[in-house]
């Protein structure tokens, strides 16, 4: 039974200080997760869906999937009824789908601030920032390797972004911290600099264990044992390979009842067939095997049907984004996920552009809109992605985060209430009049149209007098304003101390490693 997290101010001492911080904290608006009141775009009919589902079962049974360097996984599959030949697992037709049936269709990920908790699945859409880039870019410093301070600044920006529901995970890779210890600092940043839900570490099973233990400090061990407080990204090594590191992290999280996104990582034409139907077949086969394995580890473990698919430039070999083929796969995979009864992850503000320019805007908009119409429930990379995922851009982060607002508005559908019908205004104004001064307009104008908090709507003369700033420059100014006004959300000092002590102990337990 899901519970409300215990009050942070009264646990582990320090309650008075926490309550004082709570009273004086500056509050930032945060929109609730999107509730989709519009239909999904279904690109496949029943015949097409059935064909792809049958082909995926054929892949699992005849071609099989590889669980590399993982004797425990092979033993689990053998016991479940699969045929194991070396590291290859051949899953009889229907077995994976039957195992997937124990996965929940929706679940709640709890945040340390209960007002920020999110439901993942059903008609909800949860938006999370960019994940994984080793580089960052801003107008002041250009392109450079990311640092821990960059990471903290992205977490701060995410916390202050109204339309962003989730703090994410590796918003950039802090290369100035040892590889084997940076996960501790990253998780701590999410826990202390934001009160939104966040993701755990997956780069080694021991780091997943550390993530769970830190959550037990933050939320309380009893609460974590009964509730989901992390959603973490498990990438499949496409085609059809499940490596031991990712599966080890999945095992840790599934055993702890923490959520995993089971996600093929596909560049079409390189890691999957060049055709949409062929790629969808592979996506479904990989997700079926991954979700089924999570249920073998712990029946009922929360999972998300993930899809990260992009196309390839056959001239250069570079991945391409915002393409119609990728959108078709996104739409089709969404239908397959809904037929399985699983939450769905895909989409994002994806682009191959090197700068936050027109290419970045076009490509990102194509995928953001496809994700909304495709029924996505959890969208990673919703803001900040640049250069094919190699770069996290500060300016693009705030520009993208601003453009998540229209997704909320579009998803709400059409207001058909008496006020929404506008008949009062039509009667008042009549033929040849104008609506600016009528009572209906005066009563509704503040909320009638979505308005950007970043983009420029001024006349040319005013825009020119103010410096003729382009979108990137406007984004830069917003980043600076947000960071200057940032204030940490309140947290019990005793919990912060316990987190710091745990991190110090873990860092002291092994030497630094940068590889």
Task: Walk through the language-model features, giving the residues of each.
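Helix-rich catalytic cores of soluble enzyme domains
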Residues: 142-373, 377
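Catalytic-core signal marking the mid-to-C-terminal active-site face
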Residues: 2-9, 13-29, 43-55, 63-64, ...
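Acidic/polar loop patches that form or flank catalytic/metal-binding clefts of enzymes
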Residues: 342-348, 378-383, 413-422
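Glycine-rich phosphate-binding active-site loops on the catalytic face of alpha/beta enzymes
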Residues: 369-391
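Short beta-alpha connecting loops at secondary-structure transitions
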Residues: 38-41, 315-322, 349-356, 384-396
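N-terminal intrinsically disordered, cationic/polar leader segments
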Residues: 2-49, 57-61, 67-82, 90-125, ...
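Generic structural signal for well-ordered, non-membrane alpha-helical segments
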Residues: 45, 49-56, 66, 70, ...
């Amino acid at each position: 039974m899901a519970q409300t997290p215990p009050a942070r101010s009264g646990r582990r001492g320090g309650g008075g200080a926490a309550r004082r911080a709570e009273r004086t904290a500056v509050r930032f608006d945060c929109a609730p997760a999107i509730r989709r009141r519009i239909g999904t775009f279904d690109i496949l009919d029943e015949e097409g869906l059935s064909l792809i589902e049958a082909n995926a079962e054929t892949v699992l049974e005849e071609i099989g999937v590889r669980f590399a360097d993982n004797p425990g996984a092979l033993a689990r599959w053998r016991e479940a009824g699969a045929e194991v030949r070396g590291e290859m697992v051949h899953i009889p037709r229907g077995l994976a789908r039957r195992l997937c049936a124990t996965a929940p269709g929706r679940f709640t990920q709890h945040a340390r601030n209960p007002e920020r908790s999110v439901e993942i699945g059903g008609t909800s859409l949860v938006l999370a920032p960019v994940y994984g880039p080793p580089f960052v870019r801003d107008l002041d410093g250009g392109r450079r390797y990311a640092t821990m301070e960059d990471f903290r600044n992205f977490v701060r920006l995410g916390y202050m972004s109204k339309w962003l529901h989730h703090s994410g995970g590796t918003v950039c890779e802090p290369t100035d911290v040892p590889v084997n210890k940076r996960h501790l600092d990253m998780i701590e940043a999410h826990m202390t600099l934001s009160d939104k839900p966040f993701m755990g570490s997956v780069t080694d099973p021991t780091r997943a264990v550390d993530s769970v233990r830190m959550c037990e400090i933050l939320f309380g061990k009893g609460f974590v044992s009964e509730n989901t407080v992390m959603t973490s990204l498990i990438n499949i090594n496409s085609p059809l390979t499940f490596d031991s590191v990712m599966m080890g992290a999945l095992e840790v999280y599934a055993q702890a009842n923490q959520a995993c996104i089971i996600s093929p990582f596909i560049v079409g034409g390189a890691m999957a067939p060049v055709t949409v139907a062929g790629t969808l077949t592979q996506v479904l086969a990989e997700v079926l095997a991954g979700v089924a394995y999570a249920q073998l580890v712990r029946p009922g473990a929360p999972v998300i049907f993930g899809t990260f698919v992009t196309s390839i430039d056959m001239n250069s070999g570079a991945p391409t984004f915002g393409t119609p083929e990728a959108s078709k796969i996104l739409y089709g995979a969404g239908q397959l996920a809904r037929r399985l009864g699983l939450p769905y992850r895909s989409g994002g503000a994806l682009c191959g552009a090197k700068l936050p320019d027109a290419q970045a805007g076009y490509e990102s908009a194509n995928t953001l809109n496809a994700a909304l119409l495709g029924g996505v429930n959890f969208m990673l990379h919703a803001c900040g992605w640049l250069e094919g995922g190699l770069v996290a851009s500060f300016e693009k982060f705030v520009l993208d985060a601003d453009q998540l607002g229209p997704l909320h508005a579009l998803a709400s559908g059409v207001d058909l209430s008496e006020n929404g019908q506008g008949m009062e205004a039509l009667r008042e104004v009549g033929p040849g009049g104008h609506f600016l001064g009528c009572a209906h307009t005066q009563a509704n104008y503040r909320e009638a149209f979505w308005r950007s908090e970043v983009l420029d709507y001024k006349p040319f003369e005013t825009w020119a007098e103010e410096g003729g700033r382009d979108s990137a420059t406007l984004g830069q100014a917003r980043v600076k304003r947000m960071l200057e006004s940032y204030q940490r959300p309140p947290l019990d000092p005793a919990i912060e101390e316990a987190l710091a002590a745990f991190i110090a102990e873990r860092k002291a337990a092994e030497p630094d490693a940068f590889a």
